[in-house]
Swiss-Prot record:
GO cellular component, one term: glycine reductase complex
EC id: 1.21.4.2
Official protein name in the record: Glycine reductase complex component B subunit gamma
UniProtKB keywords: Oxidoreductase, Selenocysteine
Similarity-based family: Belongs to the GrdB/GrdF/GrdH family.
Subunit-structure text: Heterohexamer of two alpha, two beta and two gamma subunits. Component of the glycine reductase complex, together with components A and C. PB is substrate specific.
Catalytic activity field: acetyl phosphate + [thioredoxin]-disulfide + NH4(+) + H2O = [thioredoxin]-dithiol + glycine + phosphate + H(+)
The species this protein was found in: Peptoclostridium litorale
Protein function: In the first step of glycine reductase, the substrate is bound to component PB via a Schiff base intermediate. Then the PB-activated substrate is nucleophilically attacked by the selenol anion of component PA to transform it to a carboxymethylated selenoether and the respective amine. By action of component PC, acetyl phosphate is formed, leaving component PA in its oxidized state. Finally component PA becomes reduced by the thioredoxin system to start a new catalytic cycle of reductive deamination.
Amino acid sequence: MGKLRVVHYINQFFAGIGGEEKADIAPFVAEELPPISQNLDKLLGEDAEVVATVVCGDSFFGENLETAQATVLEMVKGASPDLFIAGPAFNAGRYGVAAGAITKAVQDTLGIPAVTGMYIENPGADMYKKSVYVMSTADSAAGMRKSLPALAKFALKYAKGEEIGSPAEEGYIERGIRVNGFKEDRGAKRAVAMLVKKLKGEEFVTEYPMPVFDNVVPGRAIVNMSKAKIAIVTSGGIVPKGNPDRIESSSASKYGKYDIDGVDDLTSEGWETAHGGHDPVYANEDADRVIPVDVLRDMEKEGVIGELHRYFYSTTGNGTAVLSSKQFAKEFTQELMAAGVDAVILTSTUGTCTRCGATMVKEIERSGIPVVHICTVTPIALTVGANRIVPAIAIPHPLGDPALSPAEEKALRRKIVEKSLKALETEIEEQTVFED
């Protein structure tokens, strides 16, 4: 038997093409193996070789899920591989979602062993860990020296049909699959030993972990929108010019509260984005492309809504820990309630930003305030647990399109906001994506 043929999937950054400015690049097969694929090839040793690297921009995949997946599948199929490896994606949200999606598609559609790797908090891990093997990695490429060898070793083992051990033994993220096994000591003895450790306050590991369900009951629909006070929250990092609170561009440790009393339009002279997870140009040109202050102010004057809340809350969601996202929302939700806010419009941009946003959505809705989540990567919002979801235009400009004239763009933004208000007026019992 000859070497196993391997196809490697990576994003534009690891292909050496560029960062966010190249995130919209369509899928293609690299003419030469990029350095990361060359390293993977060496790690696979004499048993396998990387015969092709498929590259796709993170934003392109996220904004064109079906098209991108179908195109990449054809490219993978054309290389006739025996094994498919995606990533590692670490904590890059869009990359993780793309890696998980295409790994599952290759496995299910082509019947080829497929493996990926990413950080446990990557939204792609939550979405695909039950469907495919996802090797647990560090949260950044600084962990490449450990993550890539582990991914290569496990992928080879899987492709050869060898017995796969537990997550703790192999290093993949728990899949929620229970497997019967044999132990030297009978169950009663193990149970007593576990109980004794628990009573002593010592660490112990359960043999039967229970699933954690964290869905939140949808907030009640708004009965009279013309009387409702609407607040804006965003994980898209919109801040006053100069970022006075010094909110980090990634892995935020704080959020900001900003006064928009008397503000009808978020101009480039007064507002910008602190977000480091996408090209900031579009948001810096017009921050209304991320939070629709201009449209909501018009609606307030027209009597469509009762009032736009004086303050909006903002953080940068990319790479931000789930626990931090929860804590942010828990804190400012108390202020929203005290101010008599009736509903919230929450906007997000990139992949981990959407995870952060959806996490905040749930925390706000625990108070009973209904929230609508406007985002581009809707599968992440669904996976995390947002209840009312409205699809956005694009990751760097969820509520705008720079290709349109200012008047056309504002009309497009208004259409999305109108759909969002309709979502808030609609009584739901389960997660709902409000499509056109």
